[in-house]
Amino acid sequence: MANYQNVTPVQMAQAALTTSYATLYTVPTNPTTPTRTYMKQIDVCNTTGGAVTFNLHIVPLSGSPLTSNALFYTQNVAANTTFSYAGVQVLPTSSTIQAKASTTGLTITISGGEAV
C-alpha cells in the first residue's frame, strides 16, 4: 500500500447548481504516480427566499447518479442559509462528484486535497 505524505489542498468545485445532474469534479487518473483524492468540505449556499433541496453523488467510473451512490439526497437548504458538511470522503480513481438541485438558487463549493 502506498504511503501518502504530501497533501495539496484543492478547491474541487464552485458552481451554481441546476435542475439537471452536472459533473462538478473528476478524480484524476495518474498510473505513474498514484494519488488519493479527499473531499473534506462542502458548502451549499441558498440565495433564494425559499427552501431548495439538492442531491450529491460520488459516482464510480462509467456510472450514473443513483440512490446507491448518494452522499446527500433531497438535502434541504433553508431560505438564505448555508448548509455545511465537514467530513472526509476518500474518492475512488476516475470517479466523479455529480449534483443537481430542485430549482435554481444554490451555489456549491467543495474543497479537499490530493495526496501523493
Place the predicted regions along the sequence by residue:
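C-terminal interaction-tip segments
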Residues: 1-36, 92, 100-116
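Beta-strand signatures of extracellular beta-sandwich domains
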Residues: 55-59, 109-111
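Short beta-strand His + acidic residue motifs that chelate non-heme Fe in jelly-roll/DSBH
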Residues: 42, 97-100
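Short beta-strand elements of extracellular/lumenal beta-sandwich folds
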Residues: 35-45
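Short solvent-exposed strand-capping/beta-turn motif centered on an Asx-Ser/Thr pair
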Residues: 44-49, 102
